[in-house]
Amino acid sequence: MIQQAVFNLLGIAARARKVISGEELVVKEVRNGNAKLVLLANDASKNSSKKIQDKCTYYNVEYHVIGDRYDLGHATGKEARVALAITDKGFASKLSSLLNEK
C-alpha cells in the first residue's frame, strides 16, 4: 500500500518535471547538490548501485532502494529506469516520510 502511494507521488513529481532519471544524470545532480532524494531500483547492477550509493553517502543525499527498474520507469511514465533523483524539497520530504514508514 505504501509502495503504491510512493509510485503515485513519483508520477505527480515526474509530471511536474521534478524527477531526473538515468544513472549518469542522477550522479550529476547529486554532485551539483540539486538532488534532494535518490531512488534506486533493487535490480540495479552492483556497479551502478555502488556508484550511486557511494555518491549519495559522500554528498549526504538520502537514498532508498525500492521496486525494480520497471516499477520506477512505469511510475514516471518512461521505460525501465534504474535510478531517479527528486529535485524538489517538498516532493522529496513527502516521499522520504512515506518510505521511512514501511
Can you describe what each PLM-predicted range is?
Residues 8, 28-32, 50-54, 93, ...:
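Solvent-exposed alpha-helical segments within well-ordered globular domains of core cellular machineries
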